[in-house]
C-alpha cells in the first residue's frame, strides 16, 4: 500500500497534499477553518444537488416547488434547511479564515491570498444568486435592488442591467439564468480551491509564531487529519443544531411571502453575511460612489500584501497593530448591525462613521502602526 500511495499517479497527488505533507508542528485551531470550508462546500454541493432535483426555476412555480420540497419530499425540509443554514456556516468559516489570515500575516503568500479573495467574491456571487431562487418577497426585491446597482456604470449601465435581467424587469428569464449560475458556480469554486491549495503547497503553511518552520515540521496525517476531523464534528453539530432547532433564525420572514412586484417590503436587506458591505454601500449618498465603495470593501483585502511594511510576520508580537486589528473586527460587527437597520437617523450617521473607519484602519492606521513598531524594534 505504501508503494502504491507514493508511486501511483493519482494517489501520489493525494499523498503529497493530505498525508505526507510537511506541516508546521505549532499551527493552532485557527488553521482548522480551511478544511471546514472544504467540508461546507461539499455539504452545499450535495444538498444543492438534491434540491435541484425537485426545484423548478419558473416564476409561477418556484415558490411552490420550495414548499413542495419542505412538505412532500422525504427529508426535503432537512435538506432545504441544511442548505440554507450551511451557507451561513460557510460564511462564518470564511470570515474567520480571512481574519486569521490578516492576524497571522498569511497575506505575504500573495498568490494564495489573491486566489482566496477571488474565491470570496465567487462565494458571495453564488450566495446572492441562490438567495433569489425561492422567489419570495426578499428574493425578488433583493435581486431588483442589487442588479439595479449596475445602472450606476456610466454609458453602458442601463443596457447592462437589462442584459442581466433578460428583459425590462426581474422576471422569468432572470430566475432561470440565476438558477444556472447558482448550479455552475460551486464547481468553479471547487476548481479555484484546487488552485488555492496548489499555491499554498508551493510555499508551505504559515504558523502562529510567524517564524520559518522548515526545521520543525510533522506529517499532515495522522496529526492534523485527526484535528480536522474534530473540527468537522463541531461544525456538523453546530449546523445540525441550527437546522433542526432554529432553522429560520438567520432568514427573513418576508421570504415566506411569494414575490410580488407591486408590493415593496418595508426594509429591503440581504442575508446577514452581506450586511457589512450593504452598510458601506448605503453610507454613500451617490449611487456610483456606493457601488465603488461596495467593491472596494472586499477588493481592499488585495492591498494587504502591498501595504505590509512590517519586519515581523503576523501580529503575535505587535501589540499596537493588535489593538487596531480588534477595533477593525468591532467596526465590522457595527457595520453588520447597521446594514440590517432602516435608513434613518442615527443609523445612517453611524454607518458613515463605521465605513470611514473601516477604510482608514486598513489604508492608514495599519501601515502607520507597522512603521512605528519597526522603529521601536530599532530602539
Swiss-Prot record:
Biological process according to GO: mitochondrial electron transport, ubiquinol to cytochrome c
InterPro entries cross-referenced by the UniProt entry: Cyt_b/b6_C, Cyt_b/b6_C_sf, Cyt_b/b6_N, Cytb/b6-like_sf, Cytochrome_b, Cytochrome_b_C_euk/bac, Cytochrome_b_N_euk/bac, Di-haem_cyt_TM
Give yes or no: UniProt keyword Transferase.
Answer: no
For this UniProt entry, what's an example GO CC term?
respiratory chain complex III
Which residues of the sequence carry a binding annotation for heme b b562?
Answer: 83, 182
Query: What does the UniProt entry say about where the protein is found?
Result: Mitochondrion inner membrane
Keywords assigned by UniProt, alphabetized: Electron transport, Heme, Iron, Membrane, Metal-binding, Mitochondrion, Mitochondrion inner membrane, Respiratory chain, Transmembrane, Transmembrane helix, Transport, Ubiquinone
Its biological purpose: Component of the ubiquinol-cytochrome c reductase complex (complex III or cytochrome b-c1 complex) that is part of the mitochondrial respiratory chain. The b-c1 complex mediates electron transfer from ubiquinol to cytochrome c. Contributes to the generation of a proton gradient across the mitochondrial membrane that is then used for ATP synthesis.
The record's similarity note reads: Belongs to the cytochrome b family.
| Comment field (misc) | Heme 1 (or BL or b562) is low-potential and absorbs at about 562 nm, and heme 2 (or BH or b566) is high-potential and absorbs at about 566 nm.
Q: What is this protein called?
A: Cytochrome b
Q: Which gene encodes it?
A: MT-CYB
Amino acid at each position: 500500500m505504501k508503494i502504491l500511495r507514493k508511486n501511483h499517479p493519482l494517489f501520489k497527488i493525494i499523498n503529497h497534499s493530505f498525508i505526507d505533507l510537511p506541516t508546521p508542528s505549532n499551527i493552532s485551531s485557527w488553521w482548522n477553518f480551511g478544511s471546514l470550508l472544504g467540508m461546507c462546500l461539499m455539504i452545499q454541493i450535495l444538498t444543492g444537488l438534491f434540491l435541484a432535483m425537485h426545484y423548478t426555476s419558473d416564476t409561477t412555480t418556484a415558490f411552490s416547488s420550495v414548499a413542495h420540497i419542505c412538505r412532500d419530499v422525504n427529508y426535503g425540509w432537512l435538506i432545504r434547511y441544511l442548505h440554507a443554514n450551511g451557507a451561513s456556516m460557510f460564511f462564518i468559516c470564511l470570515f474567520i479564515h480571512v481574519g486569521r489570515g490578516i492576524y497571522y500575516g498569511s497575506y505575504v503568500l500573495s498568490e494564495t491570498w489573491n486566489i482566496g479573495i477571488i474565491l470570496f467574491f465567487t462565494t458571495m456571487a453564488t450566495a446572492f444568486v441562490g438567495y433569489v431562487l425561492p422567489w419570495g418577497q426578499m428574493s425578488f426585491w433583493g435581486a431588483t435592488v442589487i442588479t439595479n446597482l449596475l445602472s450606476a456604470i456610466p454609458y453602458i449601465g442601463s443596457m447592462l442591467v437589462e442584459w442581466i435581467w433578460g428583459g425590462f424587469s426581474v422576471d422569468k428569464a432572470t430566475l432561470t439564468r440565476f438558477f444556472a449560475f447558482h448550479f455552475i458556480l460551486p464547481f468553479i469554486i471547487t476548481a479555484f480551491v484546487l488552485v488555492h491549495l496548489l499555491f499554498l503547497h508551493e510555499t508551505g503553511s504559515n504558523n502562529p509564531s510567524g517564524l520559518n518552520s522548515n526545521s520543525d515540521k510533522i506529517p499532515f496525517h495522522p496529526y492534523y487529519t485527526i484535528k480536522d476531523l474534530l473540527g468537522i464534528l463541531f461544525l456538523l453539530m453546530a449546523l445540525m443544531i441550527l437546522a433542526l432547532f432554529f432553522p429560520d433564525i438567520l432568514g427573513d420572514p418576508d421570504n415566506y411571502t411569494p414575490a410580488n412586484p407591486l408590493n415593496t417590503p418595508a426594509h429591503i436587506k440581504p442575508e446577514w453575511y452581506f450586511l457589512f458591505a450593504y452598510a458601506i454601500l448605503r453610507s454613500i449618498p451617490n449611487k456610483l460612489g456606493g457601488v465603488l465603495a461596495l467593491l472596494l470593501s472586499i477588493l481592499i483585502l488585495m492591498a494587504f500584501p502591498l501595504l505590509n511594511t512590517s519586519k515581523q510576520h503576523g501580529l503575535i508580537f505587535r501589540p499596537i497593530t493588535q489593538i487596531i486589528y480588534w477595533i477593525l473586527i468591532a467596526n465590522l460587527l457595527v457595520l453588520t448591525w447597521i446594514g440590517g437597520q432602516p435608513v434613518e437617523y442615527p443609523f445612517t450617521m453611524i454607518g458613515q462613521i463605521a465605513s470611514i473607519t473601516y477604510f482608514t484602519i486598513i489604508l492608514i492606521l495599519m501601515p502607520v502602526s507597522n512603521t512605528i513598531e519597526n522603529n521601536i524594534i530599532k530602539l
